[in-house]
C-alpha cells in the first residue's frame, strides 16, 4: 500500500497536532451497566476499572443536530472531515501503567498524531492516529493509540485467514439487544450497530455490525480470564473484517511465551479481529 500525493486536496496535515482535554467521572452506575451488558460481576467503587471499559467514558456530549448522517459526531473540528467516506475504528494499542479507579474523576488528553492518505485495493483510505493519555488525581494511568480509517463506500470483505489452533476458546452469538446496549452504555450513535435499513442500504453490510471495541474487549478478557494471575502490560488489536448480527463468534487465543499471547476472534468465514497481549514479567 503506497501513500498518495493528494493530501493537499484534503489539507490533512492541518489536523495533525489537534488537541482536546476531556474530564469525566468513573461512575459506578455506568460500570454496573457495562457489567450487565457483558454478563459479568460488577466491580465496586474504589476498585480498578476493568481494562477497555474506559471506552464508555470521555465521550463527546453532542446534540443530535451535531451528528452526521451515520450517527457519528460531525467531523471537521477535532477530527478531519470525512468527505463522503465511511468512518471505521480499525484498531489500536494500549500501554498500561495503572488502572483507573471507579468512583473518582479522571482526565483524557487527546492529540491527533498523524493523518495520512494511502491507496488500497478498494481505493483511497485516510488513516488517522489519535493518542489518548489518561490520568487520575495527577497520576498517569495508561496511554492509548486509536487508529481510525475513512474509506470510500465499498462492499465489505467477507473472508479472511483461517483461525489458528487455540489454547483457550469460548464463543458468543451477539444479539441485537447486546449491540444496542453496548452502543447505549458507550454513548455510541453510529447507526451501523442498530439501524438495519441504514447499514444494509447505505453502507452495504449484510446485517447490523458488531462493534470493534466490543470484540476487542471480549478478546482481551478471554485471555485475562484464562490467565488470572498475570498482570496486563499492553494490548494491541486490529480489525480484519466486520462481524455481523447472528455470527457465531469464537473468542480464542494462545500463549507464545511466558509474557505474550496472540488472541483473535473468528467466525465460520475466518478471522475477524486479531491482537497481541503482553504481560508484565
Across the structure, where does each feature detected by a protein language model lie?
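A contiguous, surface-exposed recognition patch within enzymatic or periplasmic domains that forms
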Residues: 5-48, 161-215, 222-225
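Generic secondary-structure boundary/loop-capping signal
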Residues: 23, 52-55, 64, 75, ...
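Hydrophobic, proline/glycine-rich low-complexity stretches
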Residues: 1-105
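Generic structural "secondary-structure junction" signal
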Residues: 57, 90, 96, 102, ...
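HotDog/MaoC-like acyl-thioester-processing domains
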Residues: 2-20, 89-174, 242-281
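Short, surface-exposed helix-loop/turn micro-motifs enriched in polar/charged residues
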Residues: 44-47, 124, 231-232
